[in-house]
Structure formats: C-alpha cells, structure tokens
C-alpha cells in the first residue's frame, strides 16, 4: 500500500500543485486559483485506488453559490491507470 502511494508521488508531474500525505493510505493534491481550489483526493484500499476531484469555491468571491462541486469519483484496479488519470486531471 505504502509503495503504491510512493510510486504515485515519485511519478507525478505536479505542475505547480502541492501534494500532501494525509494518512498512510490517502494523499491530497491541490492548487489554489483566484476563485476556487482544485483538489484531487487519492485513497488506496486493499484492491483498488479511489480518485475524487473537487472544486472548492471561495465563498467571499461567490457568496450565493455552492461551496464545493464534486466533479468525478473513479475507482481503479491498476496503479498505472490511476497515475494516468491523475496526471491528466492535473494538466486539464
């Protein structure tokens, strides 16, 4: 489990994003923009990797709108597929 998260950490091109290890089986990748923060949550389970992508909006800029928009949630069986998906999400 720890080796898979280390593999992701070592092989991701973060492009200005920040990577934090939250627990032994979870990492958070985020970057703040003017109106929102893009967050990518990666959780490793026994047989799968779950990737969630959120946009968290600044409520001072948009006080009448939603605070959080969950864009996608995907589960992967392969570390390589999850790496490709996370890297693509960072670049978009």
Label each PLM-derived region with a short phrase.
Residues 1-35, 56, 60-69, 73:
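Negatively charged, low-complexity tracts enriched in Asp/Glu with abundant Ser/Thr
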Residues 36-46:
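Broad, structure-driven detector of short, well-ordered beta-strand segments within folded domains
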Residues 45-92:
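C-terminal basic regulatory modules in eukaryotic proteins
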